[in-house]
Amino acid sequence: MTKTDPAPMAPPPRGEEEEEEEEDEPVPEAPSPTQERRQKPVVHPSAPAPLPKDYAFTFFDPNDPACQEILFDPKTTIPELFAIVRQWVPQVQHKIDVIGNEILRRGCHVNDRDGLTDMTLLHYACKAGAHGVGDPAAAVRLSQQLLALGADVTLRSRWTNMNALHYAAYFDVPDLVRVLLKGARPRVVNSTCSDFNHGSALHIAASNLCLGAAKCLLEHGANPALRNRKGQVPAEVVPDPMDMSLDKAEAALVAKELRTLLEEAVPLSCTLPKVTLPNYDNVPGNLMLSALGLRLGDRVLLDGQKTGTLRFCGTTEFASGQWVGVELDEPEGKNDGSVGGVRYFICPPKQGLFASVSKVSKAVDAPPSSVTSTPRTPRMDFSRVTGKGRREHKGKKKSPSSPSLGSLQQREGAKAEVGDQVLVAGQKQGIVRFYGKTDFAPGYWYGIELDQPTGKHDGSVFGVRYFTCAPRHGVFAPASRIQRIGGSTDPPGDSVGAKKVHQVTMTQPKRTFTTVRTPKDIASENSISRLLFCCWFPWMLRAEMQS
């Protein structure tokens, strides 16, 4: 296998903010483990990560015996070990201290850089403290060892212009923040990063809702009144809950606490605008609903994607402003009507969702009033809605060439009937054979007989039969995963049962909308993309070279 030289991906030149340092000298190979550590740092050329012969995985696993032989083999070079560290997988990041120690044993200078990402071993250690992928304890052990050997906290990656403290704040690792600031110079805590609008580490923590890192930075003297290039202090870059998507109501609790923490930390001599958006806390919820033509119990559409029943409107403890609580038709929510221990309404688990008032509109396809008059959706009267389905079907027969707008919306809201041809997950075609509740999962499910044997069963799950089809032709999917692509394929005699199931469906099809980017997204897109490049590109490059 020939090694690919990613020369076109060379890091850009240093910015003005980078500390003065001696010129790095590229070296072709790492020194042997017995060689003394060099006096000057160098930039190591990029290399692919070594893997055992006939290895089943595309990433390096330090827990595997074959990989351990490579890791502890003196012939494994420093560039190859840097390539292993670049792999953003838990198996590698949890062993950052072991791999880092092997790099140092081979004579690596404590401030040597990886030629592909321009990151030092201390940068990698701070990144490895990320919760979920990394291990903060292992990252702290390696960082303490590097700092004891004289690692420079002020060095920056030329890709992201971030130093070690910026990485620790970005990945919300307060233990690393304490270690880095313990012996660092005072000006390090307020050092700025050009890719985050020349904001400090406190700005980075605030904009990414890193509450733990923000508290630690304030404890160590971070300036809460320092302004970035846009004239914003850290409290002003905290994401506003009103701009968050529908599934981030819980994150609003963190945003509120973080903004309060930063505002209270600002000296009294510094004046800050306490309100950046209109405050509707004193507006009664019923007046807000009346202005929108809504009332509790109405069928609503959230952000053009999810349908449900309006259960609450008013102020909340987790964020300022007016919020609406909706009981969704499908278990696609985040709660049961309570957030942070405060109950606002009652609904089944995973069917409650909070959203700003601006993201709610009245659903066109409203069900009978009996469905919205009680907190919990009761079982529907099939005999009555079946007749309604027949009337709609007859109306379409009278004028098939020009159906009314109402009938089209009814068909769209119904998704599909038994016997309809559908597309599952945008990939598999089949015919609807079942719709209703199941024993294997809550909510309503479609049972589809696929055209090809790419399914999971023959219409039965865990011994319960819902429909009949050939083996491996059956699959179940929620309404959000199917798309109607044709009419019914069943004989006319089966249409009555189809209408009955047709009217039970109450979900709107999901539509694709262009996400509105907030100023925070636009301001930080360069830094985020570069950071993701440093994490993922080396692994992608390795996979491409193997293929």
From Swiss-Prot:
Bias (Low complexity): 367-377
Function: Functions as a cytoplasmic linker protein. Involved in TGN-endosome dynamics. May modulate the cellular compartmentalization of AKT kinase family and promote its cell membrane localization, thereby playing a role in glucose transport in adipocytes.
Location relative to the cell: Cell membrane; Cytoplasm; Golgi apparatus, Golgi stack
Main localization category: membrane
InterPro entries reported for this sequence: Ankyrin_rpt (IPR002110), Ankyrin_rpt-contain_sf (IPR036770), CAP-Gly_dom_sf (IPR036859), CAP-Gly_domain (IPR000938)
Single biological process term from Gene Ontology: membrane biogenesis
SMART domains per the UniProt record, alphabetical: ANK (SM00248), CAP_GLY (SM01052)
PANTHER family, per database record: CAP-GLY DOMAIN-CONTAINING LINKER PROTEIN 3, DYNACTIN 1-RELATED MICROTUBULE-BINDING
Region annotated GoLD, chain positions: 488-547
Gene: Clip3
Assembly notes: Homodimer. Interacts with AKT1 and AKT2; when AKT1 and AKT2 are phosphorylated and activated, affinity is higher for AKT2. Interacts with ZDHHC13 (via ANK repeats). Interacts with ZDHHC17 (via ANK repeats).
Region entry Disordered, spans: 1-49, 365-413
Composition skew (Acidic residues), residue ranges: 16-27
Biased composition regions of type Basic residues, renumbered to the chain: 387-399
Residues covered by the CAP-Gly domain: 314-356, 436-478
Keywords: ANK repeat, Cell membrane, Cytoplasm, Golgi apparatus, Lipoprotein, Membrane, Palmitate, Phosphoprotein, Repeat
One Gene Ontology MF term: ganglioside binding
Misc. remarks from the entry: The N-terminal half is dispensable for proper Golgi targeting, whereas the GoLD region is required.
Lipidated residues (S-palmitoyl cysteine): 534-535
Modification after translation, per record: Palmitoylation by ZDHHC17 regulates association with the plasma membrane.
One Pfam entry name: CAP_GLY
Membrane topology recorded in Swiss-Prot or TrEMBL: Lipid-anchor
Start-end of each ANK repeat: 117-158, 160-191, 197-229
PTM annotation (Phosphothreonine): residues: 374
Modified residue annotations for Phosphoserine: 399, 401
UniProt name for this protein: CAP-Gly domain-containing linker protein 3
Presence of keyword Ubl conjugation: no
Organism: Mus musculus (Mouse)
